[in-house]
UniProtKB/Swiss-Prot annotation:
GO molecular function, one term: ATP binding
Gene (name only): ispE
Active site positions: K25, D151
Positions contributing to ATP binding: P109, V110, G111, G112, G113, F114, G115, G116, G117, S118, S119
Keyword Kinase: yes
Known role: Catalyzes the phosphorylation of the position 2 hydroxy group of 4-diphosphocytidyl-2C-methyl-D-erythritol.
GO biological process: isopentenyl diphosphate biosynthetic process, methylerythritol 4-phosphate pathway; terpenoid biosynthetic process
Keywords, alphabetical: ATP-binding, Isoprene biosynthesis, Kinase, Nucleotide-binding, Transferase
Annotated metabolic or biological route of this protein: Isoprenoid biosynthesis; isopentenyl diphosphate biosynthesis via DXP pathway; isopentenyl diphosphate from 1-deoxy-D-xylulose 5-phosphate: step 3/6
Name of the protein in its database record: 4-diphosphocytidyl-2-C-methyl-D-erythritol kinase
Length: 298
């Protein structure tokens, strides 16, 4: 099986530019346990960060302006782009006089449930907080990130985590090393439509971290809905089921299988039919961005 990577575009880093990782994530399970009075659903999930993802290129501006170079996501205007919104959110929260140019080198498929937009936004918050010397602590940055999306805080904290609430109540977890065979079916189903689907299970019995550690398989609440609605997702899960326990990440449409070692994942990749958008990524013990930030002097 030949590997087919998501398309990426590379920028030549010139004077003043710096490059920063924005890792992808997987949801090792996801269930909905109820609905709050404000209409949001109560979730339980485990976030697993990956040692693979997008790259955010940043350059500090002295004139206070925020500019996006190119398009992070095709068709998304600059004002609606999460990376631009993240930069403005930090700027307004701190009254800093500086600005930034932002370029996103995309590898994470859009609409796949791999957390690309949220991770990109978190990287912008963390790195500009350092480059602008605004010195907000992680808890404050995570609170800002939550205003952009429920998945942003886990990337700000940069750790694998058990999550509850709308996904923002995090308990750090130490997960064993693993490698993942990922597959992008190439379809995007709006999350709102999935939450409105009458067949979605919204009243699962609450689980515990102990249940997860014991190996209880909870699955993903969105998987049966996606299977029914999208033949591409059903096909992807069926193909992956030939090599292991296939799961959906997030609200889809991305799918994955976990393996103990990268060699096992690579062997499984070779068994897939040619031409699929499939690749292998290692699980990370924590966000690679934190390691990069730790080595930098600001």
């Amino acid at each position: 099986m030949g590997r087919v990577d998501p398309v990426s575009v590379v920028i030549d880093d010139g004077v003043g530019w710096s490059a920063w990782p924005a890792p992808a994530k997987l949801n090792l399970f996801l269930q909905i346990t109820g609905r709050r009075v404000d209409g949001y659903h109560e979730l339980q999930t485990v976030f697993r960060l990956l040692d693979w993802g997008d790259t955010i290129h940043l350059r500090v501006r002295e004139d206070g302006q925020i500019h996006r170079i190119g398009e992070s996501v095709t068709g998304v205007v600059e004002a609606d782009d999460l990376v631009v919104r993240a930069a403005y959110l930090l700027k307004h929260a701190t009254n800093v006089y500086l600005g930034a140019d932002i370029f996103v080198e995309k590898r994470i498929p859009v609409g796949g449930g791999f957390g690309g937009g949220s991770s990109d936004a978190a990287t912008v918050l963390l790195v500009l907080n350092a480059l602008w010397h605004t010195r907000l602590d992680v808890a404050v940055l995570a609170a800002l990130g939550l205003r952009l999306g429920a998945d942003v805080p886990v990337f700000v904290h940069g750790c694998n985590a058990w999550a509850e609430g709308v996904g923002e109540c995090l308990t750090p977890m130490i997960l064993p090393g693993a490698a993942y065979l990922l597959l992008d079916p190439g379809v995007c189903v709006p999350t709102r439509e999935l939450f409105l689907d009458p067949d979605l299970t919204r009243d699962a019995s609450p689980a515990t971290i102990g249940d997860f550690i014991a190996g209880t398989a909870f699955g993903n609440a969105f998987e049966p809905v996606l299977r029914r609605r999208e033949s591409a997702v059903a096909g992807a899960l069926d193909v992956l089921s030939e090599v292991g326990f296939a799961r959906v990440t997030g609200s889809g449409s991305g799918c994955f299988v976990e393996f103990s070692t990268r060699d096992e994942a690579e062997c499984a990749l070779e068994r897939l039919p040619y031409g699929l958008c499939a690749w292998v990524a290692d699980g990370a013990s924590r966000s690679p961005l934190l390691d990069v930030l730790k080595t930098m002097e600001f």
